[in-house]
From Swiss-Prot:
This is Probable metallo-hydrolase YhfI. GO terms for molecular function: 3'-tRNA processing endoribonuclease activity; metal ion binding. Pfam families: Lactamase_B. The gene is yhfI. Its EC number is 3.-.-.-. Zn(2+) 2 binds at residues 63-64, 155, 211. Zn(2+) 1 binds at residues 59, 61, 134, 155. It is an enzyme of class 3 (hydrolase). Its cofactor is Zn(2+). The keyword Metal-binding applies. InterPro entries: Metallo-B-lactamas, RibonucZ/Hydroxyglut_hydro. The keyword Metal-binding applies. SUPFAM superfamilies: Metallo-hydrolase/oxidoreductase.
């Protein structure tokens, strides 16, 4: 399994960066997890629209879905140019039916509702879900290709259920919108110590901090998480690659 960070900022993209987007690849299958602002401009450096096999969305905040519309247009233009005719499945929850319905665009993309209490199969990947604590309905994901497992917290304040959900994951991709001396609970986000605690208590192999803030020194997030978790800790950035 190969995971490439496409975008990692919370809220809005920093200059020459993107918000949430993660490319999961196994064999010749490419799965995009979340599709935030400026993600496409980065994604197309790795895989063109016609080679993308599926998209799965954690929730419908702009910084996780802003480039869905442009992706739909990319598929449409590609079909005009004869670059593949397959309909791109976009998986999302249907708790917000208005947003879910926007995932289907003509014959180019089709919104498919995942059932949070059931595993989702997308090519070689099996995805299970955990509801998070966030102002809108949002789901964390545990993604495995049968050999390796990656857990993505999506957006959430801390909850104990992340620990069994993340148990023995090879990589934990945890949101980290706040520093150790800050409390992100009311905003539905976590700080560095909380991310480190989940990684430690779940027995994760590595920790990748993402959904980064637009203030402070990001390496301090890593240092703070390291005071709790003894494993490898990295700060996400566009182009970061993890291979299991």
């Amino acid at each position: 399994m190969k995971v490439t960070v496409i975008g990692c900022y919370g809220g809005f993209p920093a200059a020459n960066e993107a918000t949430s987007g993660y490319l999961f690849q196994s064999g010749d299958y490419s799965l995009l997890v979340d599709c935030g602002s400026a993600v496409l401009s980065k994604l197309f450096g790795y895989v063109p629209a016609e080679k993308l096999d599926a998209v799965v969305l954690s929730h419908y905040h702009h910084d996780h879905i802003a480039d869905i519309g442009p992706l739909q247009f990319a598929k449409q233009v590609g079909s005009f140019l004869g670059k593949g005719e397959h309909t791109l499945p976009i998986y999302g929850h249907d708790a917000d039916i208005e947003q879910f319905q926007k995932l289907t665009y003509k014959t180019h993309t089709k919104g498919i509702a995942y059932q949070p209490d059931q595993p989702l199969t997308a090519g070689p990947f099996t995805i299970t879900f955990l509801k998070t604590i966030h102002p809108v309905t949002c789901y964390a994901m545990r993604i495995t290709d049968g050999s390796h497992t990656v857990v993505y917290t999506a957006d959430s304040s801390y909850q104990d259920s992340f620990i069994p959900f993340s148990k023995d994951a090879d990589l934990l991709i945890s949101e980290c919108n706040f520093y150790a001396d800050q409390d992100g609970t009311s905003a539905g986000h976590m700080n560095s110590l909380e991310a480190g605690r989940i990684a430690k208590e779940a027995g994760a192999g590595e920790l990748l901090l993402t959904h980064l803030p637009h203030f402070g020194v990001h390496d301090n997030l890593r240092k703070e998480a390291k005071t709790v978790f003894n494993g490898e800790v990295n700060i996400a950035k566009s182009g970061f690659v993890w291979e299991g």
